[in-house]
């Protein structure tokens, strides 16, 4: 029942309660994870199947969420595309040299997941065996605008001025890079589903840095390009889209073709539902900082979101990843509260 719960909600089918999982549910707030972090580098944790499976399963064993997401990073496919990068603890990704010239864009290779990402297949196949029918196994990828933001900036950024400069001065160059990324990521999503992922989340985290017109020019077409290619091979697999600070883009995201819009906490759930309409499921959208507060407040906020989301087409989650300073007991309370909700018919 638990496995189908998340998939049914993603397809807006009736469910007894909202399924629940948590972005970054395998992470630094867990003592078990910190023990492995102290022994192994981040990239090794992502690419060593034994480590990635163990880390993915830590929150599953502790909290029994309805979704188990593969431990990985959105930049993982970069190596296979000829884009060297490092994942530096507490600093994030570093791409050196960053991609800023036509020659560099032309040098980006097509992605062959079978050749460069075989470890991802092993991770997902193992997770499916370990989880069985108890939860849905999720894969995830970065969407083209967000991947390009890292590739052009060379690291995380506060204002994304360099990629926006490219967008506004050399748009053809940026479109060429985005097209390469979209086709690569479409292949990667298909590969993840072939390997056992039952749903896949697209992280276009930094598309929220764009105004609606620029989102429609530089992000939305490439999200849609991925979805269309995946649908040709796996038409039934739910696809989820996450954009941080997406409130100003909600009137447009439906054109991406995804099944579920994952909302950050800055938009009211009822307002988001009204804008998105009845045909798109939603995910979210508790402020991660609420989990730093007392449990009465956590419960109150959960109930408010669930009520506003309505009885179908809602996956409970945070509005962004769980914070490293979150008490494990509060994470446990979050899961237990959602899982203990009365059936929809009894509310």
From Swiss-Prot:
Catalysed reactions listed for this entry: uroporphyrinogen III + 4 H(+) = coproporphyrinogen III + 4 CO2
Keywords of the record: Cytoplasm, Decarboxylase, Lyase, Porphyrin biosynthesis
Pathway membership, UniProt: Porphyrin-containing compound metabolism; protoporphyrin-IX biosynthesis; coproporphyrinogen-III from 5-aminolevulinate: step 4/4
Subcellular location: Cytoplasm
Coiled-coil positions: none
InterPro entries: UROD/MetE-like_sf, Uroporphyrinogen_deCO2ase_HemE, Uroporphyrinogen_deCOase
GO MF terms held by the record: uroporphyrinogen decarboxylase activity
Binding positions (substrate): 24-28, 42, 73, 150, 205, 320
Annotated family: Belongs to the uroporphyrinogen decarboxylase family.
Subunit structure and binding partners: Homodimer.
Protein name listed in UniProt: Uroporphyrinogen decarboxylase
Organism field: Gloeobacter violaceus (strain ATCC 29082 / PCC 7421)
The gene coding this protein: hemE
């Amino acid at each position: 029942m638990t496995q189908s719960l998340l998939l049914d909600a993603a397809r807006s089918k009736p469910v007894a309660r909202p399924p629940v999982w948590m972005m970054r549910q395998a992470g630094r707030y867990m003592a078990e994870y910190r023990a492995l972090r102290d022994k192994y580098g981040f990239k090794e944790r992502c690419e060593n199947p034994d480590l990635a499976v163990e880390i993915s399963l830590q929150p599953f064993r502790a909290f029994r969420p309805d979704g188990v997401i593969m431990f990985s990073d959105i930049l993982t496919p970069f190596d296979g595309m000829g884009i060297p990068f490092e994942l530096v603890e507490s600093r994030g990704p570093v791409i050196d040299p960053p991609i800023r010239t036509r020659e560099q864009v032309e040098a980006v290779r097509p992605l062959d997941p079978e050749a460069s990402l075989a470890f991802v297949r092993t991770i997902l196949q193992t997770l499916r065996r370990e989880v069985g029918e108890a939860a849905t196994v999720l894969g995830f990828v970065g969407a083209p605008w967000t991947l390009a933001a890292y590739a052009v900036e060379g690291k995380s950024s506060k204002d994304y001025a360099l990629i926006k400069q490219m967008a506004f001065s050399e748009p053809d160059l940026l479109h060429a890079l985005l097209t390469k990324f979209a086709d690569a990521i479409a292949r990667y999503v298909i590969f993840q589903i072939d390997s056992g992922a039952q749903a896949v989340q697209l992280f276009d985290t930094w598309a929220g840095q764009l105004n609606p017109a620029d989102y429609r020019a530089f992000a939305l077409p490439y999200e849609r390009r991925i979805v269309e290619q995946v649908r040709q091979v796996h038409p039934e697999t739910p696809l989820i889209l996450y954009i941080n600070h997406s409130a100003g883009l909600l009137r447009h995201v439906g054109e991406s073709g995804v099944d579920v819009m994952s909302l950050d906490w800055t938009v009211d759930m009822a307002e988001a539902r009204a804008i998105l309409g009845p045909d798109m499921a939603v995910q979210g959208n508790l402020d991660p900082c609420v989990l730093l507060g007392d449990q009465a407040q956590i419960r109150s906020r959960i109930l408010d979101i669930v009520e506003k989301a309505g009885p179908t087409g809602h996956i409970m989650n945070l509005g962004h990843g769980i914070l490293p300073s979150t008490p494990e007991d509060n994470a446990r309370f979050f899961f237990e509260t959602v899982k203990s909700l009365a059936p929809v018919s009894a509310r």
